[in-house]
């Protein structure tokens, strides 16, 4: 978990979307802290294995975000398990997790497995529709989910997911202030270095996903943008 805590910038790659070898190499050697493999739909074992094999040519840490048990495979440095706290379906909070442990609990390496308390905030995204997430939340609702994740469920990660749209930095700041031990991850709509830097001022980890496919050069520039924020914080003494 200590290695994951050190992640400030992460690229998320969808095994259901194409990326050529040249771009993958540039991404993996960009200085990002890790690559997460994961997606909402169309995730297959073949797609995951292909992407894993290609990423493993490089030294960057690689994690699998498990959304479909049929696409689960050994070989990743870590396995991230989403628990959608604002889902209206128990399946996405604990049901699927129970089934996975029932099938594979005897062979699981729990040192490599980390639960993510997800709060999905873009009601129009695929993830919200699939999980039937209640996205009609005010700031107090979201902060309450963050506190539940840290204090009641003792989750190591709280993931604010805007999935395809850029979120509210002031809300991210409020959530960060409510957390002391749980790692705050922000994902959604980061298309420019400026947006990455803005969210990196508050979130422990920023995730860049769609920009890899829609605006590749801009996506690469987000790595340096986050590093600049860390440099500014180091100079000013901010942690």
Curated annotation (Swiss-Prot):
Annotated residues that bind sn-glycerol 1-phosphate are located at 12, 159-164, 189, 209-210
Q: Which UniProt keywords apply?
A: Lipid biosynthesis, Lipid metabolism, Magnesium, Metal-binding, Phospholipid biosynthesis, Phospholipid metabolism, Transferase
One annotated GO molecular function is: heptaprenylglyceryl phosphate synthase activity
Entry's InterPro entries? Answer: GGGP/HepGP_synthase_I, GGGP/HepGP_synthase_sf, GGGP_HepGP_synthase
Pathway annotation: Membrane lipid metabolism; glycerophospholipid metabolism
Query: Does the record carry Cell membrane as a key word?
Result: no
- Could you tell me the EC number(s) of this protein? 2.5.1.n9
Query: Which residues make up the binding site for Mg(2+)?
Result: 14, 40
Reactions performed catalytically:
sn-glycerol 1-phosphate + all-trans-heptaprenyl diphosphate = 3-heptaprenyl-sn-glycero-1-phosphate + diphosphate
Assigned protein family: Belongs to the GGGP/HepGP synthase family. Group I subfamily.
Q: What does this protein do?
A: Prenyltransferase that catalyzes in vivo the transfer of the heptaprenyl moiety of heptaprenyl pyrophosphate (HepPP; 35 carbon atoms) to the C3 hydroxyl of sn-glycerol-1-phosphate (G1P), producing heptaprenylglyceryl phosphate (HepGP). This reaction is an ether-bond-formation step in the biosynthesis of archaea-type G1P-based membrane lipids found in Bacillales.
What HAMAP family does the entry give? GGGP_HepGP_synthase
- The name on file for this protein is Heptaprenylglyceryl phosphate synthase
Q: Which organism is it from?
A: Geobacillus thermodenitrificans (strain NG80-2)
């Amino acid at each position: 978990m200590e290695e994951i805590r050190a992640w400030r910038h992460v690229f998320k790659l969808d095994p259901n979307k194409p990326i050529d070898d040249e771009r993958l190499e540039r991404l993996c050697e960009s200085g990002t802290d890790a690559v997460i493999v994961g997606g909402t739909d169309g995730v297959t074992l073949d797609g995951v294995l292909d992407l894993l094999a290609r990423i493993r040519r490089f030294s960057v840490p690689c994690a699998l975000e498990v959304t479909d048990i049929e696409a689960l495979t050994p070989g990743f440095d870590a396995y991230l398990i989403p628990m959608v706290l604002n889902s209206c379906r128990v399946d996405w909070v604990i049901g699927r997790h129970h089934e996975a442990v029932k099938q594979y609990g005897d062979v699981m390496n729990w040192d490599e497995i980390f639960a993510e308390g997800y709060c999905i905030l873009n009601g129009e995204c695929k993830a919200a529709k699939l999980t039937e997430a209640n996205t009609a939340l005010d700031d107090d609702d979201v902060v309450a989910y963050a506190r539940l994740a840290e204090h009641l469920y003792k989750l190591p990660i709280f993931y604010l997911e805007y999935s395809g749209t850029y979120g509210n930095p002031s809300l991210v700041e409020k959530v960060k202030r409510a957390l002391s031990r749980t790692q705050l991850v922000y994902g959604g709509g980061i298309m420019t270095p400026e947006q990455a830097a803005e969210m990196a001022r508050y979130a422990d980890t920023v995730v860049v996903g769609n920009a890899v496919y829609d605006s590749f050069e801009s996506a690469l520039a987000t790595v340096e943008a986050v590093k600049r924020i860390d440099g500014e914080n180091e100079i000013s003494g901010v942690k």
